[in-house]
Design a protein with these regions (language model features):
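Hydrophobic h-region of N-terminal signal peptides that target proteins for export
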Residues: 10-19
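Carbohydrate-active catalytic/glycan-binding domains of CAZyme proteins
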Residues: 19-513
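Bacterial N-terminal signal peptides that target proteins for export
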Residues: 1-9
Length: 513
């Protein structure tokens, strides 16, 4: 009996140890594509694509690669030379300073090129130093590589918009890390027409290695995957791994996976932080950061622990803490400044958000001929949730909840004067789905979202007893169309009207289910 009891205890302990050695992807919940990560002593910092949302390039911090905290952004406002499409930032630590090499469209011609910003701390503040790679009609997805012999190189994807094969290119980085010297050269060319981007480089033994992403990055048909190549010379030629792709989705948990960077833990483990679309309803949370442990095989090719089939459950980094869950979001606007979680639709509105006296005052000035409102939103961390608020402004402006894709694709539910309205904007056309007299002066409003799609719209006089507004004809296809090719719908608050007549909100809440 004593033997059986001891064996039972040992088996239970073994089970706990085993459970503690796995974590569940994503490790950062919400849309944060193309993540880049560094380790500074025992602390990790990550950033990623912000696309058409400001502030630009969120910065996260972690002590274990698993539990992350949003601590800031690279830019609060876009750099003067840029206009939009803030993609694929690469954060690098060099000689005690921190550099972010980022992709953005140039204001003068809307071509995407690579800029650089510098800070004394990984959290910032960052000072923009302008474009560093201006090559052809497009240069995106920067990666900085130290060859171990005192030389640094910057690589990028080229010719993605031209009628010719895509190339991964590189150039020597100047000693100031703010310029390139010499002529760019080709690392690899996409002669197989699989598409090619999101590269990283490392050197081990006699080889230079490139991990790169292939196929379609974004949207409902994404089949992104990770391939590998190696060469005995930095300049190539590179041979492709016979086992490519070495990491892919296409299963019942992960739809697609790719575009990331490697980081080494204090224990010497190497992890690849990249993004993935989850399969099922959480697809509509966007491209979320995930981790996979990488090792070198006996054949001198990189491989991922657990195999090439990307899964949600993965080997945990040594010493990581218990993985936290997803928390509800609440802002009562009691601070003088916005919480770091908020983002706004900078291409379409000059958004002004002021916290005053426990209320948010939201307004905006349209920046395009078709733009008409200011959206202040958060990233959804799950696909099933409710959002609620209470408009309290005495204004003729629209004060509303929104599920926002962009200026042409949004759901808007709120007060316009004394009317309670639900409006659908799809493909630039606006359709009023409901228009009723406001049942009370300042109703509480709620949208219930299931599987990433709005399912019901409710109002309440007191925030406790809710009344549903009946709707017909709002199809799943229409709701899914609100998601843009490279980003998903964000829930938040909306103002439409004169910039001098702001919307006022008592609170904003996201409750996950």
């Amino acid at each position: 009996m004593k033997y059986k009891f001891t064996l039972s205890v040992l088996l239970s302990l073994a089970s706990l140890v085993s459970a503690a050695r796995t974590v569940t992807n994503p490790v950062i919940h919400g849309d944060l594509p193309d993540p880049s990560v560094i380790r500074v002593d025992s602390v990790y910092y990550a950033t990623g694509t912000s696309s058409e949302w400001a502030p630009h390039y969120p910065i996260y911090r972690s002590c274990d690669l698993v539990n992350w905290t949003h601590v800031g952004h690279v830019f609060d406002r876009k750099p003067e030379w840029t206009v939009s499409s803030f993609w694929a930032p690469e954060i690098v630590a060099i000689d005690g300073r921190y550099y972010v090499y980022y992709t953005a469209r140039r204001a003068s011609d809307s071509h995407s090129y690579i800029g650089v910003a510098v800070a004394d701390r990984p959290e910032g503040p960052y000072t923009d130093r302008g474009p560093i790679v201006v090559h052809g009609s497009e240069a995106i997805d920067a990666y900085v590589f130290d060859d171990g012999d005192g030389r640094r190189y910057i690589s990028w994807k080229a010719y993605g918009l031209d009628p010719r094969p895509i190339e991964l290119m590189a150039a020597r980085l100047g000693d100031d890390c703010l310029s390139i010297v010499g002529e760019p050269f080709t690392l690899m060319r996409d002669d197989e027409h699989t598409l090619m981007e999101g590269q990283l480089m490392f050197r081990e033994g006699d080889y230079y290695y490139i991990l790169y992403s292939i196929r379609n990055c974004c949207g409902f048909n994404s089949d992104y995957a990770v391939s590998a190549a190696r060469s005995r010379r930095l300049e190539g030629p590179y041979e492709r791994c016979p086992a490519n792709p070495i990491l892919h989705g296409g299963n019942d948990e992960i739809k697609s996976v790719g575009h990331g960077t490697l980081v080494t833990t204090p224990e010497g483990e190497r992890y690849y932080l990249c993004h993935a679309y989850m399969e099922g309803d959480d697809f509509l949370c966007g491209r979320q950061p995930v981790i996979y442990r990488m090792e070198m095989g006996d054949d001198l090719w990189p491989r991922f622990v657990g195999g090439d089939d990307a899964r949600a459950s993965v080997t945990a980094p040594a010493g990581c803490r218990a993985q936290g869950g997803v928390n509800d979001f609440y802002d009562g606007f009691d601070s003088d400044t916005l919480r770091v979680d908020w983002s706004w639709n900078y291409p379409y509105s000059d958004v002004k958000a002021v916290c005053r006296g426990g209320r948010l005052l939201l307004s905006g000035r349209p920046l395009t001929a078709t733009a008409d409102g200011a959206a202040l939103c958060v990233r959804p961390a799950r696909s099933t949730y409710s959002i609620s608020t209470r408009p309290v402004g005495c204004t003729s402006s629209t004060q509303a909840l929104t599920l926002y894709g962009d200026e042409n694709y949004a759901l808007i539910y709120g007060m316009t004067g004394h009317r309670l309205m639900i409006t659908l904007r799809a493909d630039g056309r606006e359709q009023v789905l409901a228009d009723i007299a406001a049942p009370v002066e300042s109703p509480y409003l709620r949208i219930n979202v299931d599987g990433g799609l709005a399912r019901s719209f409710e109002w309440s006089a007191n925030g406790c007893r809710w009344h549903r507004i009946d709707l017909d004809g709002l199809s799943d296809e229409t709701l899914r169309s609100l998601n843009r090719w490279d980003r998903v719908t964000r829930p938040g608050l909306y103002h439409f009207g004169s910039p001098t007549a702001p919307a006022a909100f008592d609170f904003f809440r996201v409750e996950y289910r």
